[in-house]
From Swiss-Prot:
A single cellular component GO annotation: cytosolic large ribosomal subunit
Pfam family, one: Ribosomal_L18p
GO BP terms, alphabetized: translation
Biological function: This is one of the proteins that bind and probably mediate the attachment of the 5S RNA into the large ribosomal subunit, where it forms part of the central protuberance.
Single Gene Ontology MF annotation: structural constituent of ribosome
CDD domains tied to this protein: Ribosomal_L18_L5e
Gene3D superfamilies: 3.30.420.100
Species name: Rhodopseudomonas palustris (strain BisA53)
Name assigned to this protein: Large ribosomal subunit protein uL18
Length: 120
């Protein structure tokens, strides 16, 4: 494993362990970012179930003209995810940035989810 991969894996594990200590039973909003798309899901770790999910690959997102690799797509995914989570009865979550810096697309997704009804 290269040094960069080792560093990223350690950061991801450190963030994830800090979340587990402070979660106190709340579902986790997990984010994955690739170079072309962004994915987010609300996961109940106690039951091992995904409660809501959204990504820039969905048909409605592609029809809207979002490329998936920009801040506008991240905002749309955050808004859609929050709407689906609230519809399923989830209002409080723990934000799992997955080792990514809280900046750019990650921050845009988090802000859009907060504006649409999730609290974290």
């Amino acid at each position: 494993m290269s040094k960069a991969n080792t560093t990223n894996a350690r950061r991801k594990n450190r963030v994830r362990m800090a979340l587990r200590r402070t979660a106190s039973g709340r579902p986790r909003l997990s984010v994955f970012r690739s170079s072309k798309h962004i994915y987010a899901q609300v996961i109940d770790d106690l039951k091992g179930v995904t409660l809501a999910s959204a990504s820039s690959l969905e048909k409605t997102m592609r029809e809207a003209g979002n490329t998936g690799a920009d801040i506008d797509a991240a905002k749309a995914v955050g808004k859609l995810l929050a709407e689906r989570a609230v519809k399923n009865g989830v209002k409080e979550v723990v934000f799992d940035r997955g080792g990514y810096l809280y900046h750019g697309r990650i921050k845009a997704l988090a802000d859009a989810a907060r504006e649409s009804g999730l609290s974290f």
